[in-house]
C-alpha cells in the first residue's frame, strides 16, 4: 500500500476524497479543514504526524477539492465522517477542526458519540445566534443570506456563491502573488509574516487552488453553516475539547470565551502574538494534546 494515500469513500451517489497520512498504526485524528481550504491543508505537517504517531485523516467537504458537490450541513458532514471511519476500519478517533472546520468537528463529537474521544478546535467560531455581538460582524452579504434562513438555505448559499466567485477566480487563475494578496485583508500581520516563508506560502496557495477546483459551492455551504442555527447545543459535546486561538486571531476571542464557558469540558489556550494561521506553527502541541486525550 502506498503511503500517504488518497482514496474516495462512496456515500450514496457521492464520493468523498480522503487523504490518509502520518503513522498508519498511530492515534487516528480526523481533520476538518477551514473555509477555502482542502484536505491538503496539513501536508507540511505529515512528517511530524508520523513522528508523533498520529494517523492523520483529512477529507474534502462536498464541493471542495475532489468531493462531489452537494448541499451540506453540520450533521450531514458528521455522517460522512462516520462512513469514512467505517471504510478505514477506525472505530474511535479524535477530531481536529480549523476555523470553519471547528463547528463540524464539534458536530461529529455530538453525532458520533463515543466514537469521538476528544476534540480540538483551532480558531473556531461559536453559533453566531448565541455568541454575544457576533452579528455585529455581518457584512451586506451575510445580512442578505441571514434573512433567507432558515426557510431557504439553498438561496442563502447562492448569495454566498455569487460573493465568492471573484475570489475563486483569482485563486484559480492568478499567480501566487495574486492569491496571497487576495487574502491579505482577511489575515493579521502575524499571519502575513507566517506566509513570508516560501514553503508555507507555496503550500497555502496550492491548498487554496485545490479548494476551488470545482468552484465555490463548498465555500458557500460552509458560510451557510456559519449563519444557520446549530442542530445541537454545545452542552451536548460530552468529550473533552481543547480550544486554540492566536491573540491576533481574526476569529474574535469572544467566540473563544463563549465556547470555553459553555462546553462542558473545555480547555482554552491563546497563543500570544499569533493569528488565525497559528495552528500551522503549533501542530506539535495540538497533536500531542489530542493523542494524550485520546489515550486517557
Positions of predicted regions on the chain:
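Conserved acidic catalytic loop of the alpha/beta-hydrolase fold
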Residues: 76-94
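Conserved HGGG/HGGXW glycine-rich cap/lid loop of the alpha/beta-hydrolase fold
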Residues: 17-66
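N-terminal cap/lid segment of alpha/beta-hydrolase-fold proteins
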Residues: 1-20
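Alpha/beta-hydrolase
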Residues: 140-232
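Catalytic active-site module of serine/aspartate enzymes centered on a nucleophile-bearing elbow/loop
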Residues: 265-296
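Conserved hydrolase catalytic core segment
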Residues: 92-135
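Short beta-strand/loop motif that positions the catalytic acidic residue
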Residues: 237, 243-245
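Conserved alpha/beta-hydrolase "acid-adjacent" motif
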Residues: 250-255
Amino acid at each position: 500500500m502506498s503511503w500517504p494515500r488518497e482514496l474516495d469513500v462512496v456515500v450514496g451517489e457521492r464520493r468523498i476524497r480522503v487523504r490518509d497520512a502520518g503513522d498508519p498504526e498511530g492515534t487516528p485524528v480526523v481533520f476538518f479543514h477551514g473555509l477555502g481550504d482542502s484536505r491538503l491543508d496539513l501536508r507540511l505537517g505529515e512528517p511530524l504526524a508520523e513522528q508523533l504517531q498520529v494517523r492523520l485523516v483529512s477529507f474534502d467537504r462536498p464541493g471542495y477539492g475532489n468531493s462531489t458537490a452537494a448541499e451540506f450541513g453540520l450533521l450531514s458532514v458528521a455522517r460522512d465522517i462516520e462512513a469514512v471511519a467505517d471504510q478505514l476500519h477506525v472505530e474511535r478517533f479524535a477530531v481536529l477542526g480549523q476555523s470553519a472546520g471547528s463547528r463540524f468537528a464539534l458536530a461529529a463529537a455530538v453525532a458520533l458519540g463515543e466514537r469521538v474521544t476528544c476534540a480540538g478546535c483551532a480558531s473556531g467560531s461559536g453559533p453566531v445566534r448565541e455568541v454575544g455581538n457576533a452579528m455585529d460582524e455581518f457584512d451586506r452579504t451575510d445580512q442578505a443570506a441571514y434573512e433567507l434562513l432558515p426557510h431557504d438555505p439553498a438561496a442563502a448559499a447562492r448569495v454566498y456563491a455569487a460573493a465568492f466567485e471573484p475570489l475563486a477566480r483569482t485563486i484559480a487563475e492568478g499567480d501566487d502573488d495574486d492569491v496571497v494578496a487576495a487574502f491579505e485583508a482577511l489575515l493579521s500581520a502575524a499571519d502575513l509574516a507566517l506566509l513570508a516563508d516560501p514553503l508555507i506560502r507555496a503550500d497555502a496557495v496550492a491548498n487554496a487552488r485545490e479548494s476551488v477546483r470545482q468552484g465555490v459551492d463548498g465555500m458557500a455551504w460552509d458560510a451557510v453553516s456559519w449563519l444557520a442555527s446549530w442542530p445541537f447545543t454545545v452542552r451536548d459535546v460530552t468529550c473533552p475539547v481543547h480550544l486554540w486561538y492566536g491573540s491576533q486571531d481574526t476569529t474574535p476571542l469572544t467566540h473563544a470565551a463563549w465556547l470555553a464557558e459553555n462546553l462542558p469540558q473545555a480547555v482554552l489556550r491563546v497563543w500570544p502574538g499569533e493569528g488565525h494561521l497559528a495552528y500551522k506553527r503549533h501542530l506539535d502541541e495540538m497533536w500531542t494534546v489530542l493523542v494524550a486525550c485520546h489515550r486517557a
